[in-house]
């Protein structure tokens, strides 16, 4: 569980330091500066004194004394409550302390807190009234320095304005940091080379710890100014798996480092004082990681989730991580949705849609009556307006859920108190009801509700959390009737999260929290508007000159909750079934290199199974060159293969169409239609007609049986770049900025008469069209232009569905995935882009060192042909090149794959065609 794992790490560090003390004993925005071994001098009787040994902690707003004996309470004296501070004997000390030595420190104050007596976590005990405590330092020579420090901090704490207090404390802190530097003796090796050093704070939930960051050629170090909880935190760069820039207080100052694949528990979270320091450190580590770890984007995770390679839970974790949500920052703790809405039935029916919460609405809009009241207030509110006065995620809400495993955090947040017993997390059903009906309660859930650790539901620490109005003590969380145990409750929550209903609708909730409905007019329409201070860019803290206003703003930002960083600005696509059924293409062919017929002697298309295709693609890196032939005088531009696999037809920039026999390994025919280059070719079913497109603006039909040109379609005003065919319709893309749809092109064209080609539709573009392709059933067409635009067209209505500008320069190739859910495009910019067909959203982009001119793909993996002649195998889900295969001596310009995915033919600028076989 997220918080449990985090807490375990902190407890391990506390064991290292052997202290009961933790930074959670400090106030919010307070710093721990130094500690001294000391004795608390207590008066017993008229002459007797008792000395309790311990550690005196000097903090920016308090003095804390931690006795060595755990039976004794920790003492916390707020500096603002101190009446006098000085060396013993200078404060008009109580006569009972007459024997206390001169190196004692005397504090006269009006209020003191007693904490963790017998090491029991409980609300702080408070004693009020004028009193004096004396502490003797073990090193007497430090008394004057400590007293001077306390007096300086006392002056800061007593300033009237919070802004002035913060400014003075910050100046003291920066002065201490400036007088110190990282101890180079802490390097792991004398051979380490220092790269940079700067000041920063280590961030843990609710608290930060200032110190020095140092990075060398092998390690990242953080040395706390106070040496707590250990002298140095060291991370070996070789162990780093991921790093993320973070917002802290809505400012670009954070950096989080992960050395494991755990998306919830990082190894260190640093907050810098200057964005440039953060960026420099990030760049250095990122440069180191380039060859050690793959970087994932929201789009790459989306693709994995869509295709079923990530569970709903895993995907939400990744999105939270990318959106700056961190377990180290309770104002930006990972947020998960309420899924179940039925907490009263004896049995949970996950097949009933009524069991689930409406994921298209924020929590505040689930109750229509409450929403109406909120909207009325919203309309009457002056600008800037907001619908909800509280957020769906805040430190208070997180600790509301986690108080049973994180009581010290709640005490820190609530100034030493637990919340009222009736307002605590007592019941799942009551909490859900309050989220539906409460005037100010709009909270979502946290990852723990979908994990395996039940400890946050059980009072295993036997905490005294108070007594409710009905007389019952707050203990374990009351579960719904359909949950037989905490384990059963979490399991059913997990089952609900991964259910079919949620998989179909989770994208709607993502739109609200991480997506395009988070801000602007879409947020207003979705009733999803929160206080401006919760949004990134809602306020510029650096522009606020009034220190009091600045502190107030920062406090509100940290305590009120923050909206996640926006990851998507267009509608999030739905999830799709990861396993797709093969669609028959017996009547669909085109010059696209992925939709060619199958050779007899191999399995027919109808007999192909998903397993056989999957097996072939899983071994795609095992391609071996079988044969190669140089049959053209210029670059090869298109490939088509006969049904029996014996004849290969190719087009070239040398203006010829050639027919090559695989059996005799000889060139059988060479046909020239004009003196200009041919750009693509396709073979109609029946193997009687080859169609070729040309740069002379025409499309040529060649009869194989009669051995002559049988027709010419003069349909464009500029070069025809690509042709496709399906069910008697021909599709032609051209540099004249159009794609045209023609009827009257039957599968078996008689060679004895000319045809009447009727123009059915003209799909107009703003610039030249370089490539086109059809989806499996030819209801959609994708076109790629010379200015980097990828267009998706609905062929049933001849309308443009989506237009995505995703390349800088010409789109080389574009094709649908076998299930028609995605489009892959390549361009001269070297990028491979994946686009969601439903939304037109760019969901993945990978950069290669050079343009990939052509490709075939199965939706998960890609085989592409590069400008240098290599064949590259890409793992789209892993966003990486998994294999490089040497092929042509020039660019690979076209590619064909049979339906079994076991045979491949490539054509190149080196004028060759190469025959490849899978060996497995």
Curated annotation (Swiss-Prot):
The keyword Repeat applies. It holds the Pfam family PH_FAN. GO terms for biological process: positive regulation of amide metabolic process; positive regulation of lipid metabolic process; regulation of membrane lipid metabolic process; tumor necrosis factor-mediated signaling pathway. Keywords: Repeat, WD repeat. Residues 189-286 form the BEACH-type PH domain. One of its GO terms (molecular function) is signaling adaptor activity. It comes from the Eukaryota. WD repeats lie at residues 631-661, 673-703, 715-743, 764-794, 806-836, 887-917. Residues 290-575 form the BEACH domain. One of its GO terms (cellular component) is plasma membrane. SUPFAM superfamilies: BEACH domain, PH domain-like, WD40 repeat-like. Residues 176-247 form the GRAM domain. Couples the p55 TNF-receptor (TNF-R55 / TNFR1) to neutral sphingomyelinase (N-SMASE). Specifically binds to the N-smase activation domain of TNF-R55. May regulate ceramide production by N-SMASE. This is Protein FAN. It comes from Mus musculus (Mouse). The gene is Nsmaf.
């Amino acid at each position: 569980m997220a918080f449990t794992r985090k807490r375990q790490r902190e407890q391990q560090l506390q064991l290292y330091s052997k202290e009961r003390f933790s930074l959670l004993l400090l106030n919010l925005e307070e710093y721990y500066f130094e500690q001294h071994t000391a004795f608390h001098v207590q008066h017993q009787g008229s002459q007797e004194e008792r000395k309790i040994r311990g550690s005196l902690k000097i903090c920016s707003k308090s003095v804390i004394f931690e006795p060595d004996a755990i039976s004794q309470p920790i003492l916390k004296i707020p500096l603002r409550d101190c009446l006098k501070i000085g060396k013993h004997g200078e404060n008009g000390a109580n006569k009972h302390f007459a024997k206390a030595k001169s190196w004692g420190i005397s504090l006269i104050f009006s209020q003191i807190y007693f904490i963790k007596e017998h090491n029991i976590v409980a609300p702080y005990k408070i004693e009020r009234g004028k009193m004096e405590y004396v502490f003797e330092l073990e090193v007497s020579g430090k008394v004057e320095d400590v007293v001077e420090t306390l007096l300086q901090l006392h002056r800061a704490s007593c300033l009237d304005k919070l802004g002035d207090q913060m400014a003075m404390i910050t100046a003291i802190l920066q002065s201490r940091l400036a007088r110190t530097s990282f101890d180079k003796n802490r390097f792991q090796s004398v051979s380490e080379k220092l790269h940079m050093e700067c000041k920063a704070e280590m961030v843990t939930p609710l608290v930060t710890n200032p110190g020095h960051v140092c990075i060398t050629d092998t390690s990242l170090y953080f040395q706390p100014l106070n040496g707590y909880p250990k002298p140095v935190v060291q991370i070996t760069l070789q162990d780093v798996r991921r790093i993320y820039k973070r917002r802290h207080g809505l400012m670009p100052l954070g950096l989080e480092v992960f050395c494991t694949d755990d998306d919830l528990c990082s190894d260190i979270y640093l907050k810098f004082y200057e964005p440039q320091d953060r960026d420099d450190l990030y760049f250095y580590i990122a440069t180191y990681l380039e060859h050690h770890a793959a970087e994932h984007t929201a789009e790459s995770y989306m693709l994995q989730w869509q295709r079923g390679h990530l569970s709903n839970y895993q995907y939400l974790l990744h999105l939270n991580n990318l959106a700056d949500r961190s377990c180290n920052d309770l104002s930006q703790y990972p947020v998960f949705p309420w899924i179940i809405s039925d907490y009263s039935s004896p049995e949970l029916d996950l097949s009933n849609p009524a069991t689930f919460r409406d994921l298209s609405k924020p929590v505040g809009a689930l109750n229509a009556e409450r929403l109406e009241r909120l909207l009325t207030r919203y309309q009457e509110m002056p600008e800037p307006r907001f619908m909800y006065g509280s957020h769906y995620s805040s430190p208070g809400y997180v600790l509301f859920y986690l108080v049973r495993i994180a009581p010290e955090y709640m005490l820190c947040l609530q100034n030493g108190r637990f919340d009222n017993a009736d307002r605590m997390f007592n019941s799942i059903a009551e909490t859900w009801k309050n989220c539906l009906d409460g005037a100010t309660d709009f909270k979502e859930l946290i990852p723990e509700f979908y994990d395996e650790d039940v400890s946050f539901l059980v009072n295993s620490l036997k905490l005294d959390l108070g007594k409710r109005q009905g007389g019952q003590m707050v203990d374990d969380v009351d579960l719904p009737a359909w949950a037989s145990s905490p384990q059963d409750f979490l399991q059913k929550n997990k089952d609900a999260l991964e259910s079919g209903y949620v998989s179909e609708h989770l994208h709607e909730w993502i739109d609200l929290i991480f997506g395009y409905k988070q801000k602007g007019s879409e947020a207003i329409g979705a009733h999803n508007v929160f206080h401006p201070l919760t949004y990134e860019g809602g306020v510029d803290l650096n522009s606020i000159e009034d220190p009091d206003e600045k502190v107030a703003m920062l406090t509100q930002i940290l305590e009120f909750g923050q909206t996640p960083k926006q990851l998507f600005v267009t509608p999030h696509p739905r999830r799709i079934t990861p396993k797709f059924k093969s669609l028959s293409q017996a009547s669909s062919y085109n010059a696209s290199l992925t939709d060619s017929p199958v050779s007899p002697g191999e399995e027919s298309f109808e007999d192909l199974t998903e397993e056989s295709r999957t097996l072939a693609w899983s071994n795609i890196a095992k391609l071996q060159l079988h044969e190669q032939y140089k049959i053209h005088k210029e670059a090869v531009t298109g490939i088509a293969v006969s049904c029996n696999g014996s004849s290969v037809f190719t087009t070239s920039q040398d203006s010829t169409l050639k027919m090559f026999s695989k059996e005799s390994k000889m060139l059988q025919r060479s046909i020239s239609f004009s003196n200009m280059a041919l750009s693509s070719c396709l073979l109609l079913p029946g193997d009687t007609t080859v169609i070729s497109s040309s740069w002379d603006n025409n499309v040529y039909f060649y009869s194989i049986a009669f051995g002559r040109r049988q027709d010419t379609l003069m349909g464009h005003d500029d070069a025809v770049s690509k042709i496709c065919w399906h069910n008697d319709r021909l599709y032609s893309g051209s540099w004249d900025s159009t794609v045209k749809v023609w009827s009257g092109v039957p599968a078996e064209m008689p060679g004895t008469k000319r045809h009447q080609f009727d123009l059915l539709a003209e799909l107009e573009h703003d610039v030249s069209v370089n490539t086109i392709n059809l989806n499996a059933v030819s209801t959609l067409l994708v076109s790629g232009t010379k200015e980097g635009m990828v267009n998706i067209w609905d062929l049933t209505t001849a309308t443009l569905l989506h237009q995505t500008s995703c390349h800088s320069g010409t789109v080389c190739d574009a094709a649908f995935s076998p299930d028609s859910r995605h489009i892959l495009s390549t361009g001269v910019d070297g990028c491979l882009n994946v686009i969601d067909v439903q939304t037109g959203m760019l969901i993945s982009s990978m950069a290669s060192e050079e343009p990939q001119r052509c490709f075939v793909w199965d939706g998960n993996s890609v085989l592409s042909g590069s400008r240098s002649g290599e064949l590259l195998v890409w793992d789209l889900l892993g966003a990486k090149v998994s294999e490089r295969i040497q092929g042509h001596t020039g660019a690979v310009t076209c590619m064909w794959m049979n339906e079994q995915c076991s045979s491949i033919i490539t054509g190149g600028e080196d004028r060759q065609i190469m025959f490849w076989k899978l060996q497995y």
